[in-house]
Structures are given as C-alpha cells and as structure tokens.
Amino acid sequence: MAVACTCVSAQDAELTRIKQNFSQLILPTETDEFHLNATLSSLSRTERGSDQVVVELFQRYPSDPDIIRTFLTTQTAEGTWPDINYQDKKRSGWEPRIHTERILELVKLYSTPGSSYYHSAEMEKVIHKALGWWFATKPVCLNWWYNQIGVPKTLGNAFLLFEPQMTDEERRGAIEVMEHARFGMTGQNKVWLAGNVLVRALLQNDMDLVRQARDSIASEIVTGQAEGIQPDWSFHQ
C-alpha cells in the first residue's frame, strides 16, 4: 500500500510540474517582448494572419491593457462581443475564433503577477461569461482544422492557466472542447493534435495519456520522404 501511495504522489507531482512548465511557456515575460518585437516587426500583414506559428507568436506577446479594457466594457450580457461575426461560415479566417483568442488574452493578463488585472474579480467574471457562451453554443467551423486544432490549441492554453478558477461544469466543457482533437494525421497536424490531447490529459490528470501524447509528438521528429522533416532538414506539410 505504501508503494502504491508513493507512486500516486510522484505522479501527481509530475503532473503539477508539467502544468507549471506549460504556464511559464504561455505567460509572456519582458525578455519575450524584446525578442518578439524584433521578430514580428519584420513580418508583413499577410504573414501575420496566415501562418499558425506566427499566430502563436502573437499570442505570446504581452496584451495591451487599453485593448483589454475595451474587451471588458463591450462584452454583452450573453458573454459575446458585438464586433465579432459569430455567423461567419468562412473556411479560412473563421471569425468566431476571435472569441477564443480574446479569452486567452484575458486569461493571460488575469494570470500574470504584477499586471493591473492580476486575479481581478471584474476580469474573472468576464472570462467566466465568455467561456460559458462558448460551452453552451458550441460553435463549429466548416473547416475541420479550427474544430480539431485551432480552437482547442488556443483555448487549451487558457484552460490550463484558468484551471484553478474553473467550476466543475466549466471543466467538463473544457474537456469536451479538447476531445475534438484525437491522435492521427501526419506532419505538423499530427503534432498539433497530439499537443491538444496532451492538454486534455493534463486537465483530466491522466498521466498515461500525457505519455501517449508525448510519444506521438516525439515520433514525428524523424526524417522521411512523406510529410514532416526531410533529409535536407526542410519541413514539408
């Protein structure tokens, strides 16, 4: 019995450590801002919106407090924002995704020690409303990529940061969102999907699934002739 308890305790500690590492990667630092300014200023407007890696770089950029204030003051009673076209049916640049990006921005500022909104009751209320609308409405894009990769990837980061504040109902909603991602595909899509599964595993405190997701990602770090890393070290998708 003592051995079993020790194993469970060690597993819980490992899950906590992984979650802390994720949080450190998600939250911006002053060093991040310096390097991101140099990188992002060199990109064209088209590049800034068309490449997922660039989108993720912008998500690491420190949030503008003035823009955040606008998000707080313009949110509707239902938890939406009037400038987002929630009826959009485009397969690329799907507008409802902006709702998820705003949730992440709000959660980042709420979770950053030293920010003017750190653990702000006003901010927390807005986040709960935004999450509640998404969980209740369950928006679906005609493009599978947003449903299985884009939205879970953005919201997954928010879920991990906001986990201590989530209600049981919100946790169930978060896991449902993350369950849209399953192991499969090849190349970068395979890595993104496995990364989303890993986040779900952390929310479920499922160490076995964490290891499966880790191994799925690691399996793609090889050279080959199909999608992924090529013999000349280029990457094809």
Where does each model-flagged region fall?
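Aromatic-lined, polymer-binding surfaces characteristic
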Residues: 27-48, 55, 59-60, 69-237
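Sequence-pattern detector for short linear motifs
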Residues: 22, 48-51
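Short N-terminal segments immediately surrounding and downstream of signal-peptide cleavage
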Residues: 12-28
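Intrinsic disorder/low-complexity signal
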Residues: 11-13, 50, 55
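Conserved donor sugar-nucleotide recognition element shared by glycan-biosynthetic enzymes
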Residues: 64
